[in-house]
């Protein structure tokens, strides 16, 4: 069965964007390339168990095993050595990407306290959107009782759009709740 967001993209979003931006081919229409979830665990330097918990939570959120990120340089002030494990990241593509986007827009973002929409200023100038989440508890898979501390994560939505305007329109069509 095809994903509802993938179907929505092909049947509704492509024609709407083609009309708005006057594309000559459906291949010119921007699409979401991948979604990257990154969780930096700075306190993993002192306690490696914190990294394991972060990896477990990221696995639950994404449905995919994360890659452990390592320090590129040694920083003495942070008691950090090159090659130490300091975070985890997951790259979602295809159906898992659309599933996650659907869950993010319809379930997780509305659960954020005092939510008034996501910032429109988080585009990078090349059509990619970055979103920071302060606590992982907004995701339905995370059990509140099993969490020993709140961790934030970064969500980067990489699109094939050439401009921020195109990317914003693409995400708006998917239902991303931008702040007015």
Curated annotation (Swiss-Prot):
Keywords, alphabetical: Ribonucleoprotein, Ribosomal protein, RNA-binding, rRNA-binding, tRNA-binding
PROSITE patterns linked: RIBOSOMAL_L5
Coiled coil among keywords: no
Entry GO terms, CC: ribonucleoprotein complex; ribosome
Alphabetical list of Gene3D superfamilies matching this protein: 3.30.1440.10
Any one GO MF annotation of this record: tRNA binding
Record has tRNA-binding as a keyword: yes
Record GO biological process: translation
Biological role: This is one of the proteins that bind and probably mediate the attachment of the 5S RNA into the large ribosomal subunit, where it forms part of the central protuberance. In the 70S ribosome it contacts protein S13 of the 30S subunit (bridge B1b), connecting the 2 subunits; this bridge is implicated in subunit movement. Contacts the P site tRNA; the 5S rRNA and some of its associated proteins might help stabilize positioning of ribosome-bound tRNAs.
Subunit annotation: Part of the 50S ribosomal subunit; part of the 5S rRNA/L5/L18/L25 subcomplex. Contacts the 5S rRNA and the P site tRNA. Forms a bridge to the 30S subunit in the 70S ribosome.
Family: Belongs to the universal ribosomal protein uL5 family.
Name of the protein this chain belongs to: Large ribosomal subunit protein uL5
Annotated source species: Lactobacillus delbrueckii subsp. bulgaricus (strain ATCC 11842 / DSM 20081 / BCRC 10696 / JCM 1002 / NBRC 13953 / NCIMB 11778 / NCTC 12712 / WDCM 00102 / Lb 14)
Lineage of the organism: Bacteria, Bacillati, Bacillota, Bacilli, Lactobacillales
UniProt gene name: rplE
């Amino acid at each position: 069965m095809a994903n509802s967001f993938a179907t929505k993209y092909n049947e509704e979003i492509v024609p709407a964007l083609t009309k708005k931006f006057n594309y000559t081919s459906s291949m010119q229409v921007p699409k979401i390339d991948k979604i990257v979830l990154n969780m930096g665990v700075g306190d993993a330097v002192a306690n490696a168990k914190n990294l394991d918990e972060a990896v477990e939570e990221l696995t639950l959120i994404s449905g995919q095993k994360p890659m452990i990120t390592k320090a590129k340089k040694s920083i003495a002030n942070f008691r950090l050595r090159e090659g130490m494990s300091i975070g985890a990241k997951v790259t979602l593509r295809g159906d898992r990407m659309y599933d996650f986007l659907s869950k993010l827009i319809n379930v997780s973002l509305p659960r954020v306290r005092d939510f008034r929409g996501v910032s429109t200023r988080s585009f990078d100038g090349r059509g990619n959107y970055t979103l920071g989440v302060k606590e992982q508890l907004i995701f339905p898979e995370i059990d509140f009782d099993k969490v020993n501390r709140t961790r934030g994560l970064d969500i980067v939505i990489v699109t094939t759009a050439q401009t921020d305007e195109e990317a914003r329109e693409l995400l708006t069509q998917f239902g991303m709740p931008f702040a007015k």
